[in-house]
Amino acid sequence: NGGQHMRIGLDLTSGFLVFSRMAAILKRYLEYNRFIAIEAYDPSRHYDLLITNNPIHKKEQTPVYYLKNDLDMEDLAKIRQILFA
């Protein structure tokens, strides 16, 4: 991504433990690139990507990746592709 900072919002309908685990997996998978920040979704902030399992989500200018189930390797690969395409 050419040294450009990216912010990913994580918005899950599940509880804190699931959120913590998914955030940790994403961090391990993506944050070796120090330009990527992963945080709990805040509607007032701008994100380069929103990852959610909440089907009613729509914030027009933000790309959204919908999780169907738990976060798996296929999801991680697709998320990485979106970020670095």
Where do the protein language model's features map onto the residues?
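C-terminal structured domains
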Residues: 1-85
